[in-house]
Structures are given as C-alpha cells and as structure tokens.
C-alpha cells in the first residue's frame, strides 16, 4: 500500500497488535459469539451494529459500511494517513521502523515538535508553581480554593509568572524555535516590532491533553478580576478545541469501567470533582458541546450525567448538551446544584461526600430536568403561560421512546394541573404523529445512514448470482484451492464490478505466494470502496468447508447470469417485434436458449 514501508514490516506490526485492544480504546465492546459488538464510532446509533472479529482481525459496521483492519480503523477515526497509522501501531507493538520512513512526513515531524514544546512548557509552569518564589501567588490561590498537592500533581497544574517574557526567555535559552512556540499558541508576536511575548501571564495553568495523553494546549485562570477570567490556547495544528475534552485522558479508564461520564463546564469543576471521588469527569473547553465531543463520550459510555452551574446559563447549556448527547444515543441524566453554585463552590461549601451523594447520586432524569427547565422565568399562575408550559412539556413527552415513561409524565402533568389524562394523551399522540411525519420528510433528504442500513438489509434479498459471488469470494479469501478452482473455471468473469475487481486483486495476491489471510489481503488494497466491500465479505458467517457440489452450484449461477440477461433481452425484443419472419427467428432463439438453461 505504501512503497516506502516494507510489506514484511507492515505484516510484523499487524501480527503484533490485537485489533480488539486498538478498537477497545474507542468503543465499548461486548462478546457475542465469536465476535465482539458495540456502537459504531463512525455514525450515531442506539443499537450496536459494529462488529469486530478477533479471528480475522477485521471490523465491519453493518449500519454505515465502515470496515477494515487496525490500520484502517486509525485512519478513519483519527484522520491519520496510512503511514501515520503504521507508525502509531509500530510504537504500540515496539516494532522499529526503518529510519527512512520514521517520521513519515513533514507534518508529522512538525506536530511532534509542537507537542514537545508544549510538554516542556507544562514542566516549566509546574516547576514555577511548586518550587519557586514566583509561584507563591499561584500556590496561595490554589490552597485557598482547597486544592491538594495530589490534585496538582495528577493534573500537572502550573503557574505562569507575571512577566511578559518568562517562558520566552527559557525557550530561547533551550534553543527552541520561537516561531514554532508561537504556532503552538504559547507565544504572541507583537505587531509593532515582531518581538514575541508570553501569552499566559500571572495565571494558574491547566494543561490540556489529547486522547493519547500528550499536552497540546493550556487553559489559564486569572488570580484576580482580570479579563478574560479563563484564557485558552488558540487553535493550532495540534489543538482543535471542539475535538477534545478536558480531563478525558485521565478519566477514560473510570468512564469505561462505570459506563458513565460526568460532563462539567470547566477545568476546576473536573479537578474538584476528582478530589470528591468523581473520577469520571470531563469538561468542554470554553465552548458549547460539539457533535464530535458527544460522539467521543458515547464511544466510551452509555450514560452521561450533565453537571453544569446551578444558574440560568448553566440550565441553558445543559438543555443544549442533552439534545446533542441524545442524538448520539446517550442516556442523559442531570445533576442539579442548588443556590446557583457551581460544582467547585458546592464542594467547598458542603463537602465532597455530600456532592457525590446528594448532587451526582441524586441526578434527575432528563425529562424531570426539562419540566424544571421550562418553568424557569414563567409565572404558571398566568393562564396563558401555564398553557404554553403544558404544550412544551407534552412535546417533550412525545419524544420519549417508552410508553411507560410517556404515561408516567402525562399522569404527573394531569395531577398537577387538574387536567384530563385522556385529553393529554390525545394531544400527545397528535404531536407524535406530526413529529413522525416531519421526520419521514427529513429522512428522505438527509438520513444517509438509515439508507445504508436499508441497503444492507436488501442484500439478504439479492439475486442468486450475486449471493453466489459474495459467498464464493468469502471462501476464496480463506481457501487458496477454492480460488484456484474459480480461476480455472471462471477466471475474472464476475458480474458485479466491485467483486470483479476484488477477484483480480485476489488472484494477484495468491500469485505472489501469499497464504490465505483476509486481513493481509485487505491490507494490500488501496481503493477505500474495495476495502469496505472486501471487509464485509470477509466478515460473512459461512461454513469453513465447501464441498464440490456447492462450489459447482455457485459457479454455475455466476456463469448462467449473462445468459439470463440475454434471455430477457430476447423476450423484450420479441414483444416489440412486428415482422413475422424476424419474430419466428427470435422465438426459435428463445426456445434454444431455454433448453440450454434447462427451463
């Protein structure tokens, strides 16, 4: 696939890693028969359609069609090039790549350099906080906020001195490229004279890590009333804030173990909650939750508890985040903090145990939260506002998938406002039908994933020749003698274009002396669509053995299909023929062909 990396090296890496371990870092997998299943990380779904085969070292999603091996998975989920995926797995497997291909590309070298600068800066900030007189202001602030040494060390918290050039001078003395330090967001270039100065000054520093645990950015919290209160690194080649969550790298083991994540608004909340024993907390990076962040959470947990500030802005953010998380298939709960406090303030005021027990432990269902949310700023003594509130709640109830839940909340509504339960049910059903109609319209335009699912279901109803080609190819990838028989009798005369291309590659693969191995074969394909189709075929559940009769039947079905097409063409032409002589000639052709086909 890539001429710069020897094929034997790629094979050594592939044999040295287990696809279950690689994918297991992104997807919660459960054993089902010989394979493992989970929710697809490439599209939102509620029912698992993503399958991983440890025997074949392949994965395939029966919903969106994504598939391949460990290299392909990293290419798709991380946006890696093939060489980057090889390098990542080589490090994991402790396989040394030839010097000429590692690092692979200039972009990769640049990103590694930027990360190394960030890692150095993090050590500098942490050193200043813990061991210098200049860090005393930061230490005092953190002590006042109740931060322990354990918290500071675990999250590698630091402090940026108040000087304009503290970090700049240290980097220069270490011969660090200051232009690269600027690209990483640590330094700012002054327009007047082009000189660089520190972006972070007189701030407590919170390192931000990517999914691999590498520091790629920082958040800085002012000690006083300076604006902005929180300052983040700008986006850079190694940092896109909509794709990362603060604390995710440290929290992921707990998230996966508990199958639950707690979503906070800020770094300090995550750190304070960690001290309180809530070790599965993450936070957005100063922006609203994004689809990619929601997907990242869903890949690792089914349940999400949203724990935002207890004010109106926090409730608004909770409502928006809940919608995104639900779309990704999360079960959402909401932790309500009283008195308008944020999580850190609550913990300082009432203690860690009470926070864990009374706030996180008593989380509301999302519907219960919405009933509180829609009351905000409303005077329910006013008839008009009361009716508007009831209508909004009925709309939310109509979205619930379980009849028991719908009935439960409708009864609550009926009792609270002395309304007829039957009337509420009728209104809820009317709204449900309208929503369903609107969804059907929008699905026809935008829901490509469901269309792909439908396409997959249709494969069960494929014509006999197409099923024959699929099953033969699945056997050919696993059995060289079957491939040899097919090559001798059929050659490459498959009727489906993709299958025809895969057959040609497969014959070439065996001609080079390779042993039957679907994963190795797929690794040598370059076309993404062929990789997808070949993976799907390799994942088919078939009997490992195929007898001569079955093999003959499949080959005959494939051979006969062009003749069936010709038969249909003759029948179609016969219906339109007006010349008696030509009609008789075509009729005889039809009779002869049917005899040949034994009809």
UniProtKB/Swiss-Prot annotation:
GO terms for biological process: DNA replication, synthesis of primer. It catalyses: ssDNA + n NTP = ssDNA/pppN(pN)n-1 hybrid + (n-1) diphosphate. Binds 1 zinc ion per monomer. Residues 259-342 form the Toprim domain. GO terms for cellular component: cytoplasm; DNA-directed RNA polymerase complex; primosome complex. Its EC number is 2.7.7.101. The keyword DNA-binding applies. Its cofactor is Zn(2+); Mg(2+). One of its GO terms (molecular function) is DNA-directed RNA polymerase activity. Mg(2+) 1 binds at residues 265, 309. A zinc finger (CHC2-type) spans 40-64. Mg(2+) 2 binds at residues 309, 311. Pfam families: DnaB_bind, DNAG_N, Toprim_2, Zn_ribbon_DnaG. Belongs to the DnaG primase family. Contains an N-terminal zinc-binding domain, a central core domain that contains the primase activity, and a C-terminal DnaB-binding domain. Monomer. Interacts with DnaB. This is DNA primase. It comes from Halalkalibacterium halodurans (strain ATCC BAA-125 / DSM 18197 / FERM 7344 / JCM 9153 / C-125). The gene is dnaG.
């Amino acid at each position: 696939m890539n001429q710069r990396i020897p094929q034997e090296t790629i094979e050594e890496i592939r044999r040295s890693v287990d696809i279950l371990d690689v994918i297991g870092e992104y997807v919660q997998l459960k054993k089902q028969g010989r394979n493992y299943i989970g929710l697809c990380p490439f599209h939102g779904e509620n029912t698992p359609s993503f399958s991983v085969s440890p025997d074949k070292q392949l994965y395939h999603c029966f919903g969106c069609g994504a598939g391949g091996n460990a290299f392909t998975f990293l290419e798709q989920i991380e946006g890696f090039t093939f060489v980057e995926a090889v390098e990542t797995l080589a490090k994991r497997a402790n396989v040394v790549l030839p010097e000429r291909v590692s690092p692979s590309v200039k972009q990769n070298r640049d990103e590694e350099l930027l990360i190394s600068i960030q890692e150095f800066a993090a050590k500098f900030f942490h050193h200043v906080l813990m061991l210098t007189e200049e860090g005393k202001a930061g230490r005092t602030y953190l002590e006042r906020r109740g931060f322990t040494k354990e918290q500071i060390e675990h999250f590698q918290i630091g402090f940026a001195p108040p000087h304009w050039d503290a970090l700049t001078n240290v980097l220069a003395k270490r011969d660090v490229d200051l232009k690269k330090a600027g690209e990483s967001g640590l330094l700012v270039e002054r327009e007047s004279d082009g000189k660089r100065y520190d972006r972070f000054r007189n701030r407590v520093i919170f390192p931000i890590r990517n999914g691999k645990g590498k520091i790629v950015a920082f958040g800085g919290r002012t000690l006083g009333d300076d604006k902005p209160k929180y300052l983040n690194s700008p986006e850079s080649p190694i940092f896109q804030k909509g794709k990362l969550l603060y604390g995710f790298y440290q929290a992921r083991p707990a998230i996966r173990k508990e199958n639950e994540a707690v979503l906070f608004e800020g770094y300090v909340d995550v750190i304070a909650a960690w001290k309180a024993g809530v070790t599965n907390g993450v936070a957005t990076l100063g922006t609203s939750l994004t689809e990619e962040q929601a997907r990242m959470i869903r890949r690792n947990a089914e349940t999400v508890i949203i724990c935002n500030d207890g004010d109106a802005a926090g409730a608004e953010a909770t409502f928006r985040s809940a919608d995104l998380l639900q779309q990704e298939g999360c079960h959402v709960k909401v932790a309500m903090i009283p008195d308008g406090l944020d999580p850190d303030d609550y913990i300082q005021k009432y203690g860690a145990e009470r926070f864990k027990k009374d706030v996180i432990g008593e989380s509301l269902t999302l519907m219960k939260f919405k009933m509180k949310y829609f009351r905000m700023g409303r005077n329910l003594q006013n008839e008009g506002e009361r009716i508007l509130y009831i209508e909004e709640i009925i709309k939310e109830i109509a979205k619930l998938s379980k009849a028991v839940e719908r009935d439960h909340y409708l009864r609550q509504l009926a009792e609270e406002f002395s309304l007829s339960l039957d009337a509420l049910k009728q209104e809820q059903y009317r709204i449900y039908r309208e929503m369903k109609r609107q969804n059907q319209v929008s699905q026809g335009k935008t829901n490509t994933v469901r269309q792909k699912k439908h396409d997959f279901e249709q494969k069960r109803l494929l014509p006999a020749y197409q099923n024959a080609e699929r099953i033969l190819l699945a056997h050919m990838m696993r059995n060289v003698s079957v491939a040899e028989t097919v090559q001798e009798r059929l050659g490459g005369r498959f009727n489906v274009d993709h299958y025809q291309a895969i057959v040609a590659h497969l014959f070439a693969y065996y001609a080079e002396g390779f042993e039957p191995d679907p994963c190795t074969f797929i690794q040598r394909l370059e076309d993404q669509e062929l990789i997808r189709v070949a993976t799907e075929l390799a994942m088919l559940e078939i009997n490992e053995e195929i007898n001569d009769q079955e093999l003959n039947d499949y080959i005959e079905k494939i051979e006969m299909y062009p003749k069936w097409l010709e038969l249909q063409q003759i029948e179609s032409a016969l219906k339109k023929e007006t010349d008696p002589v030509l009609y008789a000639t075509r009729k005889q052709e039809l009779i002869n062909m049917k005899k040949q086909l034994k009809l």
